[in-house]
């Protein structure tokens, strides 16, 4: 798929297992949304073959649409429509919809059911968009950034609902900027960059890194200038140091007592008081950083 002289999706090949949750990850502009929109039938592929539930999303659109649910980034609701009116309207388009009152209560929409769409908070709009995607009892649901703008409780509720869908045999394909969300939910993860697949596997397969681990250092006061580079030099060239914010850094490298001792010694020499020093396995975020060199959403992150 190209837009002018820009290639959005370049020879991408992926498959999704029935009854699973699959996460499609990548930096901004990697081609995630274009990929999903092609699978949903909103864009015609310029080459290659796309099959969703065995059907061509373009040629077999009428047969496919009743079997899938789509949560759009823009939600697709009129600005003046009330939340419950919109959900009931979508429900009437399906032969055997879910009970709208149950779905609204499940997603915490009851209190804003009479509120016009334009007055809903970002999180409420997201929850309404998810409800609209699910009300038709889809076999396959595409969710684009399902928890963006939600508070922690709303995010957890959405996670529970997506897990319940998987238990009921529904296939879920999601994109997300929250790498913790992908690691928590996904059975399979596809990471794409510049329209190409660069990694694929289960979260465990992708994060399994032998002796490589992460050390997270949180201190009581902001780091002094040049702290990141200073710590990297103290640890050696085989270690990566990422400044997460003014009081925390992540060290990725060999998992042994020597690494922890060097970090502690650096803190002492630089008069930095640790609040916590923790050792853990590589996360999906670490893998993403290694593969793309980018960290989503975290402003001011520096990576060496």
Residue ranges and their predicted role:
Residues 255-304:
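C-terminal coupling/interaction segments
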Residues 54, 93, 221, 253, ...:
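Short loop or secondary-structure boundary microenvironments that flank
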Residues 1-193, 198-199:
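ABC transporter nucleotide-binding domains
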Residues 159-254:
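ABC transporter nucleotide-binding domain
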Residues 26, 114, 243, 277-279:
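Hydrophobic/anchoring residues in structured secondary elements
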């Amino acid at each position: 798929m190209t837009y002018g002289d820009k290639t959005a999706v370049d020879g991408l090949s992926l498959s999704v297992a029935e009854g699973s949750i699959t996460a499609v990850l990548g930096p901004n502009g990697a081609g995630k949304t274009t990929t999903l929109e092609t699978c949903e039938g909103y864009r015609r592929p310029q080459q290659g073959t796309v099959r969703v539930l065995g059907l061509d999303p373009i040629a077999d659109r009428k047969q496919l649409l009743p079997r899938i649910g789509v949560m759009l980034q823009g939600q697709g609701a009129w600005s003046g429509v009330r939340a419950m009116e919109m959900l009931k309207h979508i429900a009437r388009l399906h032969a055997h919809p879910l009970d709208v009152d149950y779905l609204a209560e499940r997603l915490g929409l009851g209190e804003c059911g009479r509120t016009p769409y334009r007055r809903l908070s970002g999180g409420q709009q997201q929850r309404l968009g998810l409800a609209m995607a699910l009300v038709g009892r889809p076999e396959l649901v595409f969710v684009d950034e399902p928890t963006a703008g939600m508070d922690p409780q709303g995010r957890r509720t959405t996670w529970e609902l997506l897990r319940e869908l998987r238990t009921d045999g529904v296939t879920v394909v999601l994109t997300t900027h929250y790498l913790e969300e992908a690691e928590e939910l996904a059975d399979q993860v596809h990471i794409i960059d510049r329209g190409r697949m660069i990694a694929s596997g289960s979260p465990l397969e992708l994060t399994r890194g032998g002796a490589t681990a992460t050390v997270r250092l949180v201190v009581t006061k902001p780091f002094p200038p040049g702290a990141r580079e200073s710590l990297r030099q103290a640890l050696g060239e085989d270690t990566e140091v990422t400044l997460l914010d003014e009081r925390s850094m992540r060290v990725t490298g060999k998992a042994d007592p020597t690494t922890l001792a060097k970090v502690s010694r650096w803190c002492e020499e630089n008069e930095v008081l640790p609040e916590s020093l923790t050792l853990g396995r590589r996360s999906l975020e670490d893998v993403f950083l290694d593969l793309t060199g980018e960290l989503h959403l975290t402003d001011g992150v520096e990576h060496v």
